[in-house]
UniProtKB/Swiss-Prot annotation:
Site (Important for substrate specificity): F13, Q71, E155
Family: Belongs to the Maf family. YceF subfamily.
Functional description taken from the UniProt entry: Nucleoside triphosphate pyrophosphatase that hydrolyzes 7-methyl-GTP (m(7)GTP). May have a dual role in cell division arrest and in preventing the incorporation of modified nucleotides into cellular nucleic acids.
One function term, GO molecular function aspect: nucleoside triphosphate diphosphatase activity
CDD domains linked to this entry: Maf
Assigned GO CC terms: cytoplasm
Descriptive protein name: 7-methyl-GTP pyrophosphatase
Source organism phylogeny: Bacteria, Pseudomonadati, Pseudomonadota, Gammaproteobacteria, Alteromonadales
Chemical reaction(s) catalysed: N(7)-methyl-GTP + H2O = N(7)-methyl-GMP + diphosphate + H(+)
Residues forming the catalytic site: D70
Top-level taxon of origin: Bacteria
Length: 202
């Protein structure tokens, strides 16, 4: 393939999504500080971090198209990060119960050869059911979504937390908006469909 693909993420969920393109790719885990800067908006944060993650590939690779992605949950104009433990996950889900939450996913494609990058932000809205304390606790014990923005895994049992999903690409909720990604790759000359002629279908 003319452009090797590199995913700047150790997330198995993002890797699984990228496999839908049926193209070979490498992965690496970018080591970046994900803390928000002073007065940084949620959109600015995910844009900056997706770019930082993609550009970190220059330490490991010399050529290729690097895909960087970052996601935050926004509720009442506040950024909610990963919960890291059950206490914080229960607290987040209790806040979300009966309300809508916006998830912003920053996506960056960075060309290691030219240094050019293209970035976009994909919003997705989730309306939660009214949940009981017992339901929230049972969900957290079952799926332990402590490293996930929003304290859930929508690709698993987390789907049962929702009343409604609104957005252009449900893949963005898992962390990698594939529709936008295919468009950005095409802008760099990599058409995912045309590239299938060199890639056996699995």
């Amino acid at each position: 393939m003319k452009y090797p693909l590199i995913l700047a993420s150790s997330s198995l969920f993002r890797q699984s999504l990228l496999q839908k393109f049926n193209l070979p790719f490498d992965t690496f885990s970018p080591n970046v500080d994900e803390s928000a800067l002073n007065n940084e908006t949620p959109a600015q944060l995910v844009k900056r971090l997706s770019e930082l993650k993609a550009r970190a590939a220059s330490k490991h690779f010399s050529k290729g198209l690097v895909i960087g992605s970052d996601q935050v949950a926004v509720f009442n104009e506040q950024i909610l990060g990963k919960p890291h433990n059950k206490h914080n996950a229960v607290k987040q889900l209790s806040l979300f119960s009966g309300h809508s939450v916006t998830f912003l996913t920053g996506l960056c494609v960075y060309d290691l050869t030219s240094g050019e990058s293209k970035t976009c932000i994909e919003p997705f809205n989730v309306t939660f059911k009214t949940l009981t304390d017992a339901q929230i606790s049972a969900y957290c014990d079952a799926e332990q979504p402590y490293n996930c923005a929003g304290s859930f895994k929508s690709e698993g049992l987390g789907i049962c937390l929702f009343e409604k999903l609104t957005g252009d690409d449900p893949n963005s909720l898992i962390g990698l908006p594939l529709i936008k990604l295919s468009q950005l790759l095409a802008e760099f000359g990599l058409d995912v469909l045309s590239a299938q002629s060199n890639t056996p279908l699995s």
